[in-house]
């Protein structure tokens, strides 16, 4: 079955389902799905999640049962107090001892840099994670370089996770549902990097009612709109963010200055749709687009430079419950990152382009043969298009362009299988 938030329809990641008479339980996965095999009989079921009312139901098991549970937030008149604990042996016996799950709501309560809640700045507070210096792009995990971290947004690789030369991350906290960082002992489903995995998932959107959220910071503002497509079946979320550094710079550079028109700003946009086709099938479509724009003008010498760069990702995902013990997820993934340098003086124009584009597909299965085993297996394929350097230049009527001749094409494939066994 699945576990949902009763007010928003969001799937609940990590909801705990426990049968006291059998002292057995299960935790919902990243799609809110759970599966457990039990002997025939009648049992009490307890479903709990921090900040939500615990659900207790009497369940009769005389055949395969599929249920959907909706959890209501717990109302309280006083300030929230959350007490959490972990089994003292979890750090040494758990197969996920290198995984840290970050609470997005907790991140929003931390001091924000220039009014912006930042995922990358938050994870740098964790042990084993650091930044080389203030303003540096990326993060370092246990001595590994920034290029040794696999950063995923809804399964799509993000090659440059920073704005403003490292001061901000590309992740808008208003559009994020969960953040996991794996610093060691990476599961078999992830590959291609040595140091860590940063897995970020976007909100699915509220399938009960329209909601609008926004914020104004010192350097940027943001706006998020979410709501149902069809109530209880589908929802959407769109979120945008933009700096107004260009407006501030314009106020400090007068029109008569030789450097009038010099500017910098960044913007990004997140969107996600999901729809429940049947009780066993659900589709998701999510995307991200972000861009930094820097330009420098020297009007006296008729000289100008501009440097745009940014990421774009897209993920189309299909979830299917094949049977009570087997869950499938199929994804089609698009990723693009590019950097461009453009310069001109009088009639001469010069442009340099560099980038990487990926087209990929992935299939994942999760099999629950019994309550002590969780078997995951699947495969993926990625078609890479690398553009190390593409140059174009124009002087009056003379044009030079390398075009696609500098492109490098690559194919990457992988299969995996893993079994998480609870002794």
Describe each PLM feature range:
Residues 115-117, 192-194, 217-221, 265-267, ...:
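Residues that define the transmembrane beta-barrel architecture of outer-membrane proteins
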Residues 1-80, 84-86:
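Periplasm-facing N-terminal accessory domains of Gram-negative outer-membrane beta-barrel systems
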Residues 53, 82-186, 197, 203-204:
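Periplasmic N-terminal accessory/gating domains of Gram-negative outer-membrane beta-barrel systems
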Residues 68, 80, 120, 138, ...:
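Membrane-embedded beta-strand positions in outer-membrane beta-barrel channels/transporters
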Residues 150, 178-189, 195-203, 210-276, ...:
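Predominantly transmembrane beta-strands of Gram-negative outer membrane beta-barrel pores used
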Residues 88, 146, 158, 203, ...:
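Structural signature of outer-membrane beta-barrel domains
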Residues 274-292, 308-423:
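Face-selective signature of the C-terminal outer-membrane beta-barrel domain
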Residues 6, 109-110, 166, 210-212, ...:
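Outer-membrane beta-barrel domain signature
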């Amino acid at each position: 079955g699945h576990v949902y938030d009763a007010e928003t329809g969001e799937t609940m990641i990590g909801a705990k389902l426990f049968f006291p008479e059998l002292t057995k339980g299960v935790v919902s996965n990243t799609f809110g799905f759970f599966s457990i095999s039990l002997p025939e009989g009648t049992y009490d079921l307890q479903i709990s999640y921090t900040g939500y009312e615990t659900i207790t139901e009497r369940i009769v098991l005389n055949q395969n049962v599929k249920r959907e549970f909706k959890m209501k937030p717990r109302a309280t008149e006083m300030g929230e107090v959350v007490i959490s604990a972990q089994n003292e042996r979890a750090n040494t016996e758990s197969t996920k001892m290198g995984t840290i799950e970050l609470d997005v709501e907790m991140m929003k309560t931390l001091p924000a840099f220039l009014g912006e809640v930042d995922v990358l700045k938050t994870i740098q507070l964790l042990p084993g994670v650091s930044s080389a210096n203030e303003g540096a792009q990326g993060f370092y995990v246990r001595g590994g370089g920034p290029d040794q971290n696999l950063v995923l947004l809804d399964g799509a690789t993000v090659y440059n996770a920073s704005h403003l030369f490292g001061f901000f991350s590309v992740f808008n906290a208003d559009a994020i549902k969960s953040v996991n960082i794996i610093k060691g002992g990476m599961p078999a489903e992830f590959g291609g990097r040595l140091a860590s995995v940063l897995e970020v998932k976007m909100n699915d959107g509220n399938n009960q009612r329209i909601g609008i959220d926004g914020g104004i910071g010192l350097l940027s503002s943001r706006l998020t709109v979410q709501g149902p497509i069809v109530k209880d079946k589908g929802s959407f979320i769109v979120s945008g963010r933009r700096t107004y550094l260009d407006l501030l710079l314009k106020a400090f550079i007068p029109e008569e200055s030789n450097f009038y028109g010099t500017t910098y700003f960044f913007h990004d946009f997140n969107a996600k749709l999901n729809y429940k086709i049947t009780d066993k099938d659900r589709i998701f479509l999510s995307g991200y687009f972000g861009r930094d724009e820097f330009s420098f003008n020297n009007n006296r010498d008729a000289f100008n430079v501009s440097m745009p760069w940014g990421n774009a990702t897209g993920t189309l995902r299909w979830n299917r419950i094949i049977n009570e013990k087997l869950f499938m997820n199929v994804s089609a993934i698009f990723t693009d990152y590019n950097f461009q340098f453009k310069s001109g003086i009088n009639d001469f124009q010069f442009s340099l382009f560099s980038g990487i584009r990926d087209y990929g597909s992935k299939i994942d299965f999760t099999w629950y043969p019994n309550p002590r085993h969780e078997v995951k297996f699947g495969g993926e394929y990625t078609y890479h298009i690398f553009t190390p350097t593409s140059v174009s230049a124009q002087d009056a009527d003379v044009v030079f362009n390398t075009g696609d001749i500098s492109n490098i094409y690559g194919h990457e494939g992988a299969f995996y299988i893993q079994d998480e066994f609870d002794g």
